[in-house]
Amino acid sequence: MLVIGESINASNKSVAEAIAGRDREFLENLAKAEAAAGADFIDVNAGAGYSSPEREMAAMEWLVDVVQGATDKPLTIDSDNPSMIKVALGKYRGERLIINSVTAEPERLESIGSLAAERQAWLVALAMGTSGIPNNVEERLAACDQIMEQLTHLGLREEQIFFDPLVLPIAVDSTQGIVTLKTLQEIKSRYPDARTVMGLSNISYGLPNRKLVNRAFLLMAAYAGLDAVILDPLDAKTMGFIKV
């Protein structure tokens, strides 16, 4: 199973501060730690909410440069903004990469899908359309069908697509874990050459003993056909589950 290190994300306060302050050493050390812990890819997310598009682009460009200089691990470019992704791809020197992510929303699917096809990147596709996250398996699969049709039309191969079945907190709706696992199984059945990925920590949001919940769900997802996971590789016990 591929591991995508999630730590270099501006939703984390310390990372956001490091990006804003251009603290190269902090981010280099974090990237090196994720790589040493066993991450196969390093996710980079420079965040949003900047005072201008130019500042937003500059932050992503700088972040990609810092992280790829700290490790030889390939990167996951984490943004749903086509302009941000294009800037990041222009700075990225590696051959292997993942773009994270698209939905079935037509305009961004076209623009981001085209960027992925041009670079022959792997692409994460969320099982949702324009109306938010579906709460049932059928609507998530319908979104996957739309995405697959468009991306293959743009020139991506099935095996370049990582479908994310979507993970919602079971503290809010206890049925959502089952919905995710069933969606995962159906994706693998419909598209045997496609890959699957999920962000693990969402499942336990709002619960005590979150790491225990995460580990239990990871095992169930692996059994259902999960190919890759976005998580904190510095959590040695969870990484131990993957290495078993």
Region roles according to the model:
Residues 1-3, 40-43, 74-76, 96-98, ...:
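Structural preference for beta-strand elements that scaffold enzyme active sites
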Residues 4-29, 53-55, 100-106, 131-138, ...:
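Active-site mouth loops of central-metabolism enzymes
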Residues 35-36, 69, 89-93, 110-121, ...:
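Acidic (Asp/Glu)-rich catalytic clusters
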Residues 35-73, 165-177:
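Glycine-rich, proline-tolerant flexible connector loops at the mouths of alpha/beta enzymes
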Residues 43-46, 73-81, 96-107, 124-127, ...:
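Catalytic beta/alpha-barrel core
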Residues 51-62, 79-87, 104-117, 132-142, ...:
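Active-site-adjacent beta->alpha loops and helix N-cap segments on the catalytic face
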Residues 53-79, 83-94, 181-198:
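Alpha-helix-loop-beta-strand connector modules within alpha/beta enzyme cores
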Residues 119-244:
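Catalytic alpha/beta core domains of metabolic enzymes, predominantly
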